[in-house]
């Protein structure tokens, strides 16, 4: 019985650790909007001038990181998706550049450094 309790405790700790990482993980970065975005880029560029360059802007854009995705029809697509599919229109991208992306989703310092 103690073995089962230990496994239950380990599973609970693992779930709590994963939840903490999901909510507080730095993978997405901080959200920067308007003046905060400009200051974050300024600071990042000041630091990156002293360090080696990261990825180029064209590399980032090639990864489709800052582009909208085309609509795809699936079996469980909503009525709105079906209407767009039938009309031949594409949904408008929810962001148009790195500034919008950083405001909506957040950016890491390495992502901000591509504009330097």
Curated annotation (Swiss-Prot):
Coiled-coil intervals: none
GO biological processes: adenylate cyclase-activating G protein-coupled receptor signaling pathway; positive regulation of oocyte maturation; positive regulation of ovulation
Known role: Induces oocyte maturation and ovulation in vitro in ovarian fragments and induces spawning behavior and gamete release in vivo. Probably mediates its effects by binding to a G-protein coupled receptor located in follicle cell membranes. Following receptor binding, stimulates GTP-dependent adenylyl cyclase activity in follicle cell membranes of fully grown ovaries at stage V but not in young ovaries at stage IV, leading to the production of cAMP. This stimulates the production of the maturation-inducing hormone, 1-methyladenine, in stage V but not stage IV ovaries.
Propeptide, chain numbering: 51-90
Family indicated by similarity: Belongs to the insulin family.
InterPro entries xrefs: Insulin-like_sf (IPR036438), Insulin_CS (IPR022353)
Protein name (record): Gonad-stimulating substance
Gene that specifies this protein: GSS
Quaternary organization: Heterodimer of a B chain and an A chain linked by two disulfide bonds.
Tissue-level expression: Expressed at high levels in the radial nerves. In the radial nerves, detected in the peripheral area proximal to the tube feet but not at the side of the hemal sinus. Expressed at low levels in cardiac stomach and pyloric caeca with trace amounts in the ovary, testis and tube feet.
């Amino acid at each position: 019985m103690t073995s089962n309790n230990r496994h239950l405790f380990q599973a609970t700790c693992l779930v709590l650790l994963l939840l903490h990482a999901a909510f507080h993980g730095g993978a997405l970065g901080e959200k920067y909007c308007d003046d905060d975005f400009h200051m974050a880029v300024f600071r990042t560029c000041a630091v990156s001038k002293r360090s080696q360059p990261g990825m180029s802007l064209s590399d980032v854009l090639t990864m489709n990181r800052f582009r909208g995705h085309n609509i795809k029809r699936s079996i469980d697509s909503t009525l709105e998706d079906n209407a767009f599919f039938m009309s031949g229109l594409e949904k408008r991208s929810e962001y148009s550049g790195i500034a919008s992306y950083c405001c909506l989703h957040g950016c890491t310092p390495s992502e901000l450094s591509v504009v330097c």
